[in-house]
C-alpha cells in the first residue's frame, strides 16, 4: 500500500514537470488606429431652430405687407400735394408784383383826381385878372415890406400882385405860382375870388363860369 502511494506521487510529479509554466502577461501596446476613431467623434446635433414662419401665420404676413404698401402710398400723396402747392404759390407770387403795380397806379390816379377836384388851383385867366401894382405906388404905413412867400424884401420897381378882398401884396411870380396850386391867400387863407362889390358884374360872370368849369373837369 505504501509502495502504491509512492508510485502515484512520482507519476504525478512527472506530469507536473511536463506542464510548462504560463508565460508572463505582455504589456498592452497602444493601437494608433484607434485615434482616428476618436477624432471622428461627432457631437450630438444641436437643437433645431424655432420656425418663425410657424409663429407668424400667413394672415399676419399679408397684413404686414398691406400696411407697408399703405404707408408708401400716403407718403407719395403728401409729397405730390406739397409740390403742387409750392408751384401754385410760386406762380401767384411771380404774377403779384405786376398786379400790385397796376393797383397802386389806379389808386394813385384816383387819389390825384380827388385832390384836383377837392382842392383845385385857380386857372390862368383868373390869376391874370387880379390887379398888378408897383411897390413904390402901393407903399404905405400898413404895407408889408417883404413877400410872405419868398421872404424877399420889396423894392420900389418890384411888380406886385394884389389879391381882392384881403388886399395882400406879393411878388408877381411868387403869387402866380402859389395860386396855380392853391385857391386861397397864403397869409389869411381866404379865397381870392373877386366879389361883386370890388369887380364889375361883367367880369364876375365869366370868372364864376370858368371856376365852375374847372371844378367839373
Curated annotation (Swiss-Prot):
Zinc finger map (RING-type): 147-189
GO biological process: protein ubiquitination
Entry protein name: RING-H2 finger protein ATL70
One GO MF term attached to the UniProt entry: zinc ion binding
Record's keyword terms, sorted: Membrane, Metal-binding, Transferase, Transmembrane, Transmembrane helix, Ubl conjugation pathway, Zinc, Zinc-finger
Entry's free-text remark on domains: The RING-type zinc finger domain mediates binding to an E2 ubiquitin-conjugating enzyme.
Involved pathway(s): Protein modification; protein ubiquitination
GO CC annotation terms, alphabetical: membrane
Catalytic activity: S-ubiquitinyl-[E2 ubiquitin-conjugating enzyme]-L-cysteine + [acceptor protein]-L-lysine = [E2 ubiquitin-conjugating enzyme]-L-cysteine + N(6)-ubiquitinyl-[acceptor protein]-L-lysine
EC main group: transferase
Biological source species: Arabidopsis thaliana (Mouse-ear cress)
Lipid bilayer topology: Single-pass membrane protein
CDD domains: RING-H2_EL5-like
Intracellular or extracellular location(s): Membrane
Family designation: Belongs to the RING-type zinc finger family. ATL subfamily.
Membrane-crossing residue ranges in chain numbering: 61-81
Amino acid at each position: 500500500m505504501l509502495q502504491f502511494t509512492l508510485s502515484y506521487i512520482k507519476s504525478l510529479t512527472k506530469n507536473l514537470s511536463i506542464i510548462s509554466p504560463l508565460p508572463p502577461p505582455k504589456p498592452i501596446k497602444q493601437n494608433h488606429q484607434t485615434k482616428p476613431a476618436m477624432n471622428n467623434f461627432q457631437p450630438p446635433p444641436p437643437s433645431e431652430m424655432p420656425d418663425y414662419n410657424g409663429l407668424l401665420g400667413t394672415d399676419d404676413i399679408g397684413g404686414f405687407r398691406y400696411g407697408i404698401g399703405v404707408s408708401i402710398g400716403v407718403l407719395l400723396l403728401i409729397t405730390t400735394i406739397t409740390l403742387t402747392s409750392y408751384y401754385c404759390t410760386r406762380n401767384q407770387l411771380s404774377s403779384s408784383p405786376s398786379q400790385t403795380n397796376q393797383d397802386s397806379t389806379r389808386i394813385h390816379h384816383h387819389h390825384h383826381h380827388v385832390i384836383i377836384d377837392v382842392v383845385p388851383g385857380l386857372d390862368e385867366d383868373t390869376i391874370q385878372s387880379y390887379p398888378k401894382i408897383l411897390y413904390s405906388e402901393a407903399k404905405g404905413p400898413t404895407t408889408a415890406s417883404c413877400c410872405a412867400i419868398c421872404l424877399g424884401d420889396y423894392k420900389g420897381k418890384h411888380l406886385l400882385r394884389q389879391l381882392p378882398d384881403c388886399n395882400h401884396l406879393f411878388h408877381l411870380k411868387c403869387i402866380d405860382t402859389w395860386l396855380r396850386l392853391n385857391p386861397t391867400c397864403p397869409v389869411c387863407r381866404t379865397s381870392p375870388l373877386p366879389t361883386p362889390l370890388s369887380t364889375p358884374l361883367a367880369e364876375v360872370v365869366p370868372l364864376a363860369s370858368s371856376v365852375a368849369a374847372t371844378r367839373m373837369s
